[in-house]
Structure formats: C-alpha cells, structure tokens
Amino acid sequence: MIEADRLISAGTTLPEDVADRAIRPKLLEEYVGQPQVRSQMEIFIKAAKLRGDALDHLLIFGPPGLGKTTLANIVANEMGVNLRTTSGPVLEKAGDLAAMLTNLEPHDVLFIDEIHRLSPVVEEVLYPAMEDYQLDIMIGEGPAARSIKIDLPPFTLIGATTRAGSLTSPLRDRFGIVQRLEFYQVPDLQYIVSRSARFMGLEMSDDGALEVARRARGTPRIANRLLRRVRDFAEVKHDGTISADIAAQALDMLNVDAEGFDYMDRKLLLAVIDKFFGGPVGLDNLAAAIGEERETIEDVLEPYLIQQGFLQRTPRGRMATTRAWNHFGITPPEMP
C-alpha cells in the first residue's frame, strides 16, 4: 500500500480535495486554530499596510494538510493584492521564475509550494529578487554573454514546505517572517468540520462533528475528507443526518479507529507487539514482516505514530510504547 491509497494520508491531495477551496477561510478573522500564527500575522499585515509596504517574505512550514496554501491566500486577501501560485518542481529553469517575477505588480504575493525542491540554478535567481527586488539575467552565450539587471516591483514571496531542514541557509535567511503550523487541537477541528458541514448543506450534530474531529489526526485536510465519506454513509444507510453514532459507524467501516489509525498503522504496531514482543526490531526486519518498503515505513507510517507516542525509534530499533499495548487491550510485559 502506498501513501496515495490511504484515506488518512495528508501528504496526498485527492481530486475531491480541490472542492475544499470553496470552504476555506478567506480572511484572518475566519481562520481557526494556530492562535500564535494568527495573532502575529495580523500585526505584520496591519503594519505593512500602514506603511504602504509589501509584506516581508514569509516562510510557512509544517506537516502536510495543515493549511499552508490557505494561509498564503489569506495573506493576499488581507493585503488586497494578487496571488500568483507555483511550486518548486515546476520551476525547472531560471527563465521560468524570471517570467513569473516580471509579471508581478507592486506588493503582489508569489506563492511557491514545496520550495525545498527548487533547483540550485533557480534558487540563485531568487536571492537578488528577494533581497534587492532585482533580477539578474544573462543575455547571449560565450564571449558575447552579458548580464543585465531588471528592477522588480516590491513583492512578497511566500514559501511553503514540509521539510524546513532541507532549505539552504542562504534561502532560509532571506525570509523575514517564519511561521510553523502545528497539528490542530480537537475543538478547533470540530469547529472546522461543523463549518464545512454547513457549507455542504449537511445536518450534523455537534457530537457528530466531534467524532470526525477526533479521528482526523489533527489535520483539517483529513477532517474534510472523512466528513465527505461520513456524508456518503449517512445518505445511503440513513436519512442523511450525521450524529455521533452514525459518524462512528461510518469511520469504523472505513477502518479509521478512535486514534485516527488505519489498517496499515495497526498492522505495523501489531507486528512490533506480536512478532517482536514489543521490540526493539530493526527496520529491515519490520519491513519484511509487514510487506512494505523501508522508505514507506520511515516516511509515511512512522511519523504520526512517533508523534503521538505509540512508537519509539531507538538506536537498537523500533519499540512499541505502553500506549500502543494499551490501545490494543494487550498487557505490556513487565520491565526487567
């Protein structure tokens, strides 16, 4: 099973996730969760507007599905400017970036998703553009080649990444504002689910929204995805109204348990517990035991389990925590 096959994967965007754009918040006052980010951005945006300046360059990082693109849209809306969107892998040549930069109007926002995947050649072009609002372009080839400078209007670059550590220091240092998005708390996710249900014209109880929020792994993208599947279940099996019981039935049918774990999460944890007595177990042995690639375990399955305290990564291998044993109703062995 690959990440794209998993309903609870925030790292992949399904076609239906595009429909979420209609229900995304447009302004900071509509933005739920991330209180520190929201309060800071409100000050930075107001200050920039009072001075009549472009907002300083902004780097947004954090796990996938937490709203980095949404925040970029909110910044552009609050500043009253255009938003130009692209991504690191798309900008293959320096000319690709130059074309976007020269089409910007004063104070516009250029949003680059997956900015950690910019090629070194493109990144070099970005440095003077960010620092001096200038574009250095080479004209011609060989001995006749010459460099010309093009002045750019003041603009805001917003970079988004799930891997802030992969950014080069020169690029990271050019961002005046750096914001980290954290996993959402259940009450905030409950509000997001209820809001989405209203936009979708669904009749949903507060307890129903809470049940979806609890299993959404702290991620709005997953919450909205689960909501659509619960809606399908409620419309086919019941009268369309979503209560806590109906939401629980739907999510149980989808193999998403109370912790937001799916079949693959449980398979990994049970392999560590049952086949390796709780660990430690080496990555290669674990991969063979569950029939997955070691890269899939490291990049897709492990992070959330470790973050939630169900799995430990130790020098001797992976170990199931007491919380993992308790999750399956199994008594952990006595510690020597």
Swiss-Prot record:
One of its GO terms (molecular function) is ATP hydrolysis activity. SUPFAM superfamilies: P-loop containing nucleoside triphosphate hydrolases, Winged helix' DNA-binding domain. DNA binds at R294, R313, R318. Changing A250T: Defective RFR, UV light resistant, sensitive to MMC. Its cofactor is Mg(2+). It comes from the Bacteria. Monomer in solution. Homodimer in solution. Homohexamer. Forms a stable RuvA-RuvB-Holliday junction (HJ) complex in the presence of non-hydrolyzable (d)NTPs; in the presence of hydrolyzable (d)NTPs branch migration occurs. Two oppositely facing RuvB hexamers sandwich possibly 2 RuvA tetramers at cruciform DNA structures. Homododecamer composed of two hexameric rings; when bound to DNA in the presence of ATP-gamma-S and Mg(2+). Forms a complex with RuvA without DNA. Forms a complex with RuvC without DNA. This is Holliday junction branch migration complex subunit RuvB. It comes from Escherichia coli (strain K12).
